[in-house]
Amino acid sequence: MNGSPTPKRYSSKSSRLYDDYYNIPYQYSNPTPMNRDYNDVGSRINADKLVPEEYKRNTEFINKAVQQNKELNFKLREKQNEIFELKKIAETLRSKLEKYVDITKKLEDQNLNLQIKISDLEKKLSDANSTFKEMRFPKVKDPMVDDDPVSENYDQINVPKHRAPDATGNPRTTNKVSNTSDQDSRLKAIERTLSVLTNYVMRSEDGNNDRMSPLPSPLNTISPINNRLNFQEPKRYNPTVKVNPSDDDIMMYESAELKRVEEEIEELKRKILVRKKHDLRKLSLNNQLQELQSMMDGDDNIKLDNVSKHNHATHRHSSQSSRDYSPSSDACLECSNDLYEKNRVKPENNMSETFATPTPNNR
């Protein structure tokens, strides 16, 4: 027998495990469910068995075709973008090609014109040289050569009396050499001046063309006449003058030209804007002047009408006293002016009256 004061507290059935706690069926096993087509999760078991092989193959083929279609669409977009960029580049190159073709045509025409001018100038130069030689050295008949050299008349030779002892040369030959040297130097100087003149003429005719290269001229090695003709244009950086200019040079030149043109356009726009502002200001001032003139003309007309209608002879005011001729009185301006003129007294009389002694009336 239990001697505990509370025996039921520790011997109740509620705290005791029930008998079949460890005898739960299927606790440590995995039995097959009742519906054999589905598993524990609820998905079908061996669902592919119901689908035929043809359908499987068709789905695989369709999936592959869809994937290939996506890849081909992506490649097609890339190719289209490349074609678009290439078209842009081709358009720019075509425009540049047309521009360069026009430039080459112009340069060819200029070159042809220059060649024609050069040929004409060369002809003129040759004619001028021939005429100068004819004028400078007229044709003289060749003297007859005698077989006997002793027959020459040596009495006509002017031999200097005081000759140097070592001077063994012939004075006639020395005179000829000096004359020929002087003539050659003069001819060279004339040819140089003619070349300078031709270059100056060509430069003056083609000075408006910026693309033409300046012709070489020997202006620094000639007499002061050529220094007077030393008209050199300011040099500009023009890569088209080169034989084979690079694309960078051409682009730099074009950008500089565009910048210069844009600056000129901005300057012209600014001038036009200032001119417009001045015109608008002038118009507004003219309008104000006309309005003021019209207002002045209207006021003058109103005053003339009032003067013609007003009769001062019959006009009476509330204040007819002689002292009430101030502008603040009820009298009109004309009447107040009349009163002022009537009652005005000279300053001499006023002063005499003020300092005079009063006299009684009954004297």
Swiss-Prot record:
<comment type="similarity">
    <text>Belongs to the SPC42 family.</text>
</comment>
<keyword id="KW-0175">Coiled coil</keyword>
<dbReference type="Pfam" id="PF11544">
    <property type="entry name" value="Spc42p"/>
</dbReference>
<feature type="modified residue" description="Phosphoserine">
    <location>
        <position position="284"/>
    </location>
</feature>
<feature type="compositionally biased region" description="Low complexity">
    <location>
        <begin position="319"/>
        <end position="329"/>
    </location>
</feature>
<feature type="modified residue" description="Phosphoserine">
    <location>
        <position position="217"/>
    </location>
</feature>
<keyword id="KW-0597">Phosphoprotein</keyword>
<dbReference type="InterPro" id="IPR021611">
    <property type="entry name" value="Spc42"/>
</dbReference>
<feature type="coiled-coil region">
    <location>
        <begin position="248"/>
        <end position="297"/>
    </location>
</feature>
<feature type="compositionally biased region" description="Polar residues">
    <location>
        <begin position="349"/>
        <end position="363"/>
    </location>
</feature>
<dbReference type="GO" id="GO:0005816">
    <property type="term" value="C:spindle pole body"/>
</dbReference>
<feature type="region of interest" description="Disordered">
    <location>
        <begin position="160"/>
        <end position="184"/>
    </location>
</feature>
<protein>
    <recommendedName>
        <fullName>Spindle pole body component SPC42</fullName>
    </recommendedName>
</protein>
<dbReference type="GO" id="GO:0005634">
    <property type="term" value="C:nucleus"/>
</dbReference>
<keyword id="KW-0963">Cytoplasm</keyword>
<feature type="modified residue" description="Phosphoserine">
    <location>
        <position position="329"/>
    </location>
</feature>
<keyword id="KW-0539">Nucleus</keyword>
<feature type="coiled-coil region">
    <location>
        <begin position="62"/>
        <end position="136"/>
    </location>
</feature>
<feature type="modified residue" description="Phosphoserine">
    <location>
        <position position="213"/>
    </location>
</feature>
<feature type="region of interest" description="Disordered">
    <location>
        <begin position="310"/>
        <end position="363"/>
    </location>
</feature>
<feature type="compositionally biased region" description="Polar residues">
    <location>
        <begin position="170"/>
        <end position="182"/>
    </location>
</feature>
<keyword id="KW-0206">Cytoskeleton</keyword>
<dbReference type="GO" id="GO:0005737">
    <property type="term" value="C:cytoplasm"/>
</dbReference>
<comment type="function">
    <text>Forms a polymeric layer at the periphery of the spindle pole body (SPB) central plaque which has an essential function during SPB duplication and may facilitate attachment of the SPB to the nuclear membrane.</text>
</comment>
<comment type="subunit">
    <text>Component of the SPC110 complex containing at least CMD1, SPC29, SPC42 and SCP110.</text>
</comment>
